[in-house]
A protein has these predicted regions:
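Amphipathic alpha-helical packing segments from all-alpha helical-bundle domains
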Residues: 78-124
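Short alpha-helix boundary/capping elements
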Residues: 62-65, 76-80, 141-148
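Hydrophobic alpha-helical connector segments
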Residues: 23, 38-74
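Short, hydrophobic secondary-structure boundary micro-motifs
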Residues: 69-71, 80, 131, 156
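C-terminal peripheral helix-coil segments that are non-catalytic and often amphipathic
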Residues: 109-125, 129, 133-179
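Short, basic, alpha-helical segments at the C-terminal edge of helix-turn-helix-like DNA-binding modules
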Residues: 26-33
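Helix-turn-helix
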Residues: 1-19, 23
Length: 179
């Protein structure tokens, strides 16, 4: 009020509270990026990288389900690509130190497309069959979304550790189906 603004002023810049939350949630990606940078190394096979990316992603998303659901599955998640590109223009150091594959994943805001670069490398290395890759990616994204929504709906009744373990049993099953 002292600055001459009130809560209605926010709606000159954002469609509603959920869009404002989307913008403010980007900051949570910094912690995820730092942890990812510490876990990934360029000597990893693509399948190891993919597993590590998801271990870090699941850890952060299950700990902050409201934030990650808003970012990747919320009402305005379609705006995330524009927001992320702008964010990395302003804060390029946040992506420094990531491998090329993880950089391409981080820049890709559409959760359904973000795994494509690492999946292509997995196909090249023989870890996944090309014709099965799109189904594996889609299944993993949908299962993650489902688990995230379960946490949002039943936070008090759910053990996050147990939820993570169940998710990774399915994840490992999908990746090791042909091996």
């Amino acid at each position: 009020d002292k600055a001459g603004y009130n809560t209605a002023t926010i709606y000159n810049y954002f469609e509603d509270l959920e869009e404002l939350i989307l913008y403010s949630s980007i900051d949570y990606l910094k912690i995820y990026l730092k942890d990812l940078r510490n876990e990934i190394n360029s000597d990893m096979k693509a399948i190891e990288m993919y597993e590590t990316i998801y271990k870090v992603f699941v850890h952060h998303s299950f700990e902050k389900p409201e934030i990650f659901h808003t970012l990747f599955f919320g009402k305005y998640s379609y705006k995330l690509e524009k927001i992320i590109k702008k964010y990395y223009e302003i804060f390029p150091d946040d992506i420094t130190g990531q491998t090329d594959i993880t950089k391409s994943i981080l820049i890709e805001a559409d959760i359904h497309n973000r795994d494509i670069p690492v999946m292509k490398q997995m196909i090249k290395e023989g870890s996944v069959l090309e014709e099965e890759a799109p189904y594996i990616m889609e299944a993993i994204v949908r299962i993650h979304q489902s688990y995230l929504e379960n946490i949002l709906q039943q936070r008090e009744q759910i053990s996050l550790e147990e939820h993570k373990n169940k998710f990774f049993k399915i994840f490992d099953f999908l990746l090791n189906f042909n091996n």
